[in-house]
Regions:
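Short glycine-aspartate micro-motif
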Residues: 13-17, 55-57, 119-124, 130, ...
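Fold-independent oxyanion-binding glycine-rich loops
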Residues: 18-19, 99-101, 125
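Short glycine-rich anion-binding loops that position phosphate/pyrophosphate groups of nucleotides
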Residues: 21, 61-64, 126-130, 226-227
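Adenine-nucleotide phosphate-binding core of ATP-dependent small-molecule kinases
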Residues: 31-54, 171-232, 249-260
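Short glycine-rich, Thr/Ser-proximal phosphate-binding strand/loop in the N-terminal lobe
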Residues: 4-44, 70-72, 139-161
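Glycine-rich phosphate-binding loop and adjoining helix at the ATP-binding site
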Residues: 35, 39-44, 55-56, 62-119, ...
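Glycine/GP-enriched mid-protein hinge/lid loop-to-helix segment characteristic of carbohydrate kinases
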Residues: 26-27, 39, 96, 111-199, ...
Length: 268
């Protein structure tokens, strides 16, 4: 974790959760952003989100150089690849940057479901598949500040794990349906929908169990929008992790909507 000094609290600060289509702001605003857009479009959205704040703590997906604030993504924000966040925006603000999955994990360790544990892992289920771990209060990160052990690229089936356990994985074979709607079908007893959630739980557990065992994880949390339907896959997840002797708890984060902001607050 960064040892840089915390922000001075006298200056106006904003917390930003930057996604591929929206920027969620700690003041309640949601600013549209097109991660496939032009440099100008991306800059304008970021400027609107920052408004008149003098300091900002920013959660953003990787690859990204979190120490220096440099975009390194090619699949998103390609128009600003290699550029510095602060230079794109201009002005004289101060920034702290953190991987979005790391931010959520920090939030849950500070004031959520992970608070009582020393070895915590987080899986985020949404458009993509995220994974982060913390041991004794320290995030496990690579040299750029991204989670040390990415699981989305783990080989599985005819592709990678993210192909199966993410939005596109849950909706394989379904046209014009959202994961929320699929969950509603499952809640109404639709057998195929129930099996889809159960299968995704089995797949995920089988792939991450060796990692959880290796690091002695005690608490496994689930975040992201799909985790709102965790109860539909809880049984198969727990069955698949029954041989992880260190594991004491598995379940959704305490505050899906605010966990990332809670993590960003710890940077201030």
């Amino acid at each position: 974790m960064s040892t840089r000094p915390a922000f001075a609290t006298a200056m106006k600060t904003i917390l930003l959760d930057v996604g591929g289509t929206f920027i969620k702001c700690s003041d309640g605003r949601e600013i549209p952003i097109d991660s496939d857009g032009s440099r100008e479009d991306i800059a304008n959205s970021l400027k609107e989100a920052l408004a008149d704040a003098q300091k900002a703590a920013v959660a953003i997906p990787g690859p990204f150089d979190y120490e220096h604030g440099i975009f390194l993504m090619k699949h998103k924000f390609a128009a600003v690849y290699g550029e510095c966040f602060a230079e794109i925006i201009g002005g004289n603000r101060e920034y702290r940057f953190i991987h979005d999955v790391n931010a959520m994990l920090l939030g849950e360790m500070a004031s959520g479901a992970g608070k009582a544990y020393e070895r915590v892992a987080l899986v985020t289920l949404g458009t993509g598949l995220g994974f982060s771990m913390s041991l004794e209060g320290h995030l496990l990160m690579n040299e750029l500040g991204s989670p040390l052990v990415p699981v989305y690229t783990l080989p599985f089936g005819d592709g990678i794990l993210e192909d199966y356990v993410s939005k596109r994985g849950f909706l394989r074979g379904y046209q014009g349906l959202t994961v929320k709607e699929l969950a509603q079908r499952a809640g109404e007893g639709d057998r195929a929908a129930l099996e889809r959630f159960a299968d995704r739980g089995t797949i995920l557990a089988s792939c991450i169990a060796p990692i959880l065992k290796e690091y002695g994880i005690q608490c496994l949390l689930f975040g992201g929008q799909i985790s709102r339907s965790y109860f539909l896959m809880a049984k198969t997840v727990e069955e698949g992790l029954r041989n992880v002797d260190s594991l004491q708890y598995a379940g959704p984060v305490q505050d899906i909507g605010n966990a990332t902001f809670n993590g960003l607050k710890t940077l201030l």
